[in-house]
Amino acid sequence: MMANIWWSLPLTLIVFFAARKLAARYKFPLLNPLLVAMVVIIPFLMLTGISYDSYFKGSEVLNDLLQPAVVALAYPLYEQLHQIRARWKSIITICFIGSVVAMVTGTSVALLMGASPEIAASILPKSVTTPIAMAVGGSIGGIPAISAVCVIFVGILGAVFGHTLLNAMRIRTKAARGLAMGTASHALGTARCAELDYQEGAFSSLALVLCGIITSLIAPFLFPIILAVMG
């Protein structure tokens, strides 16, 4: 057991940084470090019989670092404060519309495909951070665990393909790119933005926070409306 725990942290770091080197060298979207780490580590754990609990205990320090990492996102916001003040009305409008669209589209598609209201409620908060999504999903009758899975899936999609899509649409403005990524793919999209550009990361962080607040406030009122319209 101790051997399994000891290897968890170096395994995670080696795979992640190796994936970063590959991504920097080949510039291929699917070489996203998070995605590569999952593709490598999950089969490794299954093949070796190491339980997730053992793996998590060994790499728990990385989980503990998430809290200061989130707090550190406030610094880029402070650096861009003058631009945020100048555009605050547009920023709030964009985040509000983006949050509503994210909730309506995912939930509506799920209902059209025959999903139960419980599953639809779980999918609704897919574009916000995991703790908020689990709380919101549970409060409107969903299953928090499914909400968490949806958040991870959407975040990976955004981190892997988000910038490719923005480039294809010829969206070049840093603020617009950051707001789009933060609104659509929460923390994982924000992390990707922060890797590529300081200003993008700042605006993505702002969208991450605002969309979490907006979603938690309007989801309880919006979900019954979606059910009534789609039902």
UniProtKB/Swiss-Prot annotation:
UniProt xrefs under InterPro entries: CidB/LrgB, YohK-like
Primary localization class, coarse: membrane
Any coiled-coil regions, as ranges: none
Stretches in topological domain Periplasmic: 1, 51-90, 230-231
GO cellular component: plasma membrane
Cytoplasmic side of membrane: 23-29, 112-118, 161-208
Membrane topology: Multi-pass membrane protein
Cell location: Cell inner membrane
Key words, A-Z: Cell inner membrane, Cell membrane, Membrane, Transmembrane, Transmembrane helix
Membrane-spanning intervals of the chain: 2-22, 30-50, 91-111, 119-139, 140-160, 209-229
Keyword Signal set for record: no
A Pfam cross-reference name: LrgB
Similarity comment text for this entry: Belongs to the YohK (E.coli)/YwbG (IPA-22R) (B.subtilis) family.
NCBIfam families recorded: CidB/LrgB family autolysis modulator (TIGR00659), PRK10711.1 (NF007983)
Name of this protein: Inner membrane protein YohK
Protein species of origin: Escherichia coli (strain K12)
